[in-house]
């Protein structure tokens, strides 16, 4: 068993920290401390704001002075990150394709979840926090599927998080994905409007008239003998949206373990593919500090490029 000890901290709340609940603030400040311990020290009155006891739902205001007490907690050895996990964290440093004082943008590798949960203790956001232990604030702006690679926005300030998430809600952010799909995509199929319903038991998403309105726009990038490379732009942001909409048209994405086609997977597997061929390649949005439009491109990993080379040769 190892032990984690923190020192007493006094934090002056500025405009950027204001507006968040004290429990969420403490979870950011005490990253290695279990949630149960955080709620306990709040409940016992050990956390003080302006020298007064507060409840977990208290929302911080600019000018507040927060006292965070010293905390000691035992850490089980199996919870300590092994060397393989540390190597993955180090590798992620090289996947950061843009960074400034307000945000960073990651070219997330396929197979990495955006956050821990559902049996996963470590995700991209946890890895970034491990890389930047001094960072006061690191939060996901949006999410992409674990098996999807590509652009992932992370806010470094609460004001940036609010600004960027507002753009996602207002649908002013333009996102473009590259996907390799089975068969010959029809040039006439430029938009798929099909409501999506998620099964809460197995998380499978299907087109269903009772589902949420969902729209994806498509463009053909390159045609092959048995496949098509397409660009997909989701107008709405439903779970598995691009994957289900392509399946719905009869052209599932290569190596999609939920919605794919085994014969097509076997064919592309012979070309070296062993992961979902879906990549968040391009994004356009307004910078949170000055509203200037930005465009970011994330290159595909060499494995996907090699598959395309193999398909061209097969033609």
Swiss-Prot record:
Keywords: Isomerase, RNA-binding, rRNA processing. The keyword RNA-binding applies. It holds the Pfam family PseudoU_synth_2. It is an enzyme of class 5 (isomerase). Its EC number is 5.4.99.24. The keyword rRNA processing applies. Residues 20-93 form the S4 RNA-binding domain. GO terms for molecular function: 23S rRNA pseudouridine(955/2504/2580) synthase activity; RNA binding. It catalyses: uridine(955/2504/2580) in 23S rRNA = pseudouridine(955/2504/2580) in 23S rRNA. The active site is at 145. One of its GO terms (biological process) is enzyme-directed rRNA pseudouridine synthesis. PANTHER family: MITOCHONDRIAL RNA PSEUDOURIDINE SYNTHASE, RIBOSOMAL LARGE SUBUNIT PSEUDOURIDINE SYNTHASE C. Responsible for synthesis of pseudouridine from uracil at positions 955, 2504 and 2580 in 23S ribosomal RNA. NCBIfam families: PRK11025.1 (NF008249), rluA_subfam (TIGR00005). Belongs to the pseudouridine synthase RluA family. This is Ribosomal large subunit pseudouridine synthase C. It comes from Vibrio parahaemolyticus serotype O3:K6 (strain RIMD 2210633).
């Amino acid at each position: 068993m190892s032990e984690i000890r923190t020192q007493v901290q006094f934090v002056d709340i500025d405009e950027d920290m204001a507006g968040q609940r004290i429990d969420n603030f403490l979870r950011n400040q005490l990253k290695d401390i279990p949630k149960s311990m955080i709620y306990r020290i709040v409940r016992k009155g050990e956390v003080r704001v302006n020298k007064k006891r507060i409840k977990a739902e208290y929302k911080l205001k600019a000018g507040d002075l927060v006292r965070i007490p010293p905390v000691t907690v035992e850490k089980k050895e199996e919870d300590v990150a092994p060397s393989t996990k540390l190597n993955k964290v180090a590798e992620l440093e090289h996947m950061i394709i843009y960074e400034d004082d307000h945000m960073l943008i990651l070219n997330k590798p396929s197979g990495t979840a955006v956050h821990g949960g559902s049996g996963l203790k470590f995700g991209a956001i946890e890895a970034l926090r491990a890389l930047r232990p001094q960072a006061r604030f690191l939060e996901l702006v949006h999410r992409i599927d674990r098996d999807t690679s590509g652009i992932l926005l992370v806010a470094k300030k609460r004001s940036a998080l609010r600004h960027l998430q507002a753009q996602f809600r207002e649908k002013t952010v333009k996102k473009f994905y590259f996907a390799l799909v089975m068969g010959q995509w029809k040039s006439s199929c430029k938009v798929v409007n099909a409501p999506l319903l998620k099964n809460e038991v197995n998380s499978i998403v299907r087109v269903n008239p009772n589902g949420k309105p969902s729209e994806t726009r498509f463009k053909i990038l390159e045609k092959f003998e048995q496949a098509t490379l397409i660009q997909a732009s989701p107008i709405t942001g439903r779970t598995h949206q691009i994957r289900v909409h392509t399946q719905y048209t009869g052209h599932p994405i290569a190596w999609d373990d939920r919605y794919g086609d085994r014969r097509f997977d076997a064919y592309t597997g012979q070309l070296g593919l062993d992961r979902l061929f879906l990549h968040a390649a391009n994004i356009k949005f307004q910078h949170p500090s000055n509203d200037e439009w930005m465009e970011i491109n994330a290159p595909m990993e060499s494995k996907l490029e090699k598959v395309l080379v193999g398909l061209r040769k097969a033609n």
